[in-house]
Amino acid sequence: MQVQILRMSRALAELGVRQQVLTVGFPGLPRVRRDSENLVVRITRAPLPRLRSRITGLVGLNQAWLAAALTECVKLRRRWPADLIQVHLDGQLWALLAGPVAARLVGVPYTVTVHCSRLAVYQPMSTVDRIQHPLVTAVERWALRRAAGITTLTERTATVLAAELGAAQRVIDVVPDAVDPDRAEAAPAEVERLKKRFGLPQEGGPVIGFVGRIAHEKGWRHAVQAVAELADAGRDFTFLVVGDGPQRADMEAAVAEAGLTDRFVFTGFLPNDEIPAVMTALDVLLMPSVHEELGGSAVEAMLAGTPVAAYGVGGLCDTVGKVTPSLLAAPGQVAELARTVKRVLDDPAPVLAELRAGREWLADEFGVHHAAGLALAHYERVLGKER
């Protein structure tokens, strides 16, 4: 989500939209960075004890962000007057509270981008999450009804929210995750360097990948099970895991317990400008997500010419399902997902032809400049309504 926010913020800055982005950030980054003339990124995170969480990474991380972000709003309201507050929702409680409270503090309306909605696609991630799910769902409904506008990543979620909110919310627009089609596919030299760096086969054995946050909702357990099924079938391959997350140690332990350590390569976090080389290097991207609002990684992979084998959940039905529908497996069906990967490896030509045919649609629908234009139109619509 943070990659998408930064990409969209930069595109909006090019269109002349002045922005102050308040984000939890990553350790080691500067507290304030002027990214461009119209874009300032501020890390807002109150001090908190380093207690590990298998959901957020650190216990209290979201609360620490909210407290610091609201404090920053108070500081900014006089020296940097804003027209609108934009909040990005991830299905968790604290971001839902940010919009209404910040809007009151600053005295301007707020709009929200729904990256993950409990009303539409979200699936609880733990016992505690299941217990609090009805409460957080109610808070989401409350926050969305009070927003001056809403953007969703898909028509699917927009339709659900329109039905849920009714006349209380009339400004709902679709602004999908954005990619840069011109940079989606890496040059052969970049791919070769990446393969050499991580000890991947230069030729011959296929590379299957998992790219993203290593957390429950991304379905990493299903990825390990699918790899086990492929290994049992005698397939020769390397499985590349790109990314980090609160459950990385759990995934590594599960891989070792399954006797698959020699099949896996973990890269840890990689900068976003290295992802095109990753996607181009893969023969198949595996996305066994439990829930997925859109699935920007799938779009990036397909634009790089890489097939995506995924569960048919959320927005993956609208991306993978439109371009290569035969690569969607029923949610939770690991054996079917493994068979899908095997089919692509055995006979990639039909799927690659579908990807070539679908590239123009992907570039038009998810290109960053197109998405930024939609976002700007949404802001103008919201402010026109408010004024």
UniProtKB/Swiss-Prot annotation:
Q: Which GO terms describe its biological process?
A: kanamycin biosynthetic process
Which Cys-Cys disulfides exist here? none
Q: Could you tell me which pathway this protein works in?
A: Antibiotic biosynthesis; kanamycin biosynthesis
Q: Name one Pfam family in it.
A: Glycos_transf_1
Q: What sort of enzyme, by top EC class, is this? A: transferase
To which protein family does this belong?
Belongs to the glycosyltransferase group 1 family.
Q: Which SUPFAM superfamilies does UniProt cross-reference here?
A: UDP-Glycosyltransferase/glycogen phosphorylase
Which gene carries the instructions for this protein?
Answer: kanF
Q: Kindly state which keywords UniProt assigns to this record, in alphabetical order.
A: Antibiotic biosynthesis, Glycosyltransferase, Transferase
Q: What is this protein called?
A: 2-deoxystreptamine glucosyltransferase
Keyword presence, Acetylation: no
Question: Known InterPro entries for this protein?
Answer: Glyco_trans_1, Glyco_trans_4-like_N, Glycosyltransferase_grp1
Catalytic activity, reaction form: 2-deoxystreptamine + UDP-N-acetyl-alpha-D-glucosamine = 2'-N-acetylparomamine + UDP + H(+); 2-deoxystreptamine + UDP-alpha-D-glucose = 2'-deamino-2'-hydroxyparomamine + UDP + H(+)
Q: Which GO terms describe its molecular function?
A: 2-deoxystreptamine glucosyltransferase activity; 2-deoxystreptamine N-acetyl-D-glucosaminyltransferase activity; hexosyltransferase activity
User: Could you tell me the superkingdom of the organism this chain comes from?
Assistant: Bacteria
Record lineage: Bacteria, Bacillati, Actinomycetota, Actinomycetes, Kitasatosporales
EC numbers for this chain: 2.4.1.284, 2.4.1.283
- What does the record give as the function of this protein? Glycosyltransferase involved in the biosynthesis of kanamycin by mediating conversion of 2-deoxystreptamine (2-DOS) to 2'-N-acetylparomamine using UDP-alpha-D-glucose as sugar donor. Can also accept UDP-alpha-D-glucosamine, but with a much lower activity compared to UDP-alpha-D-glucose.
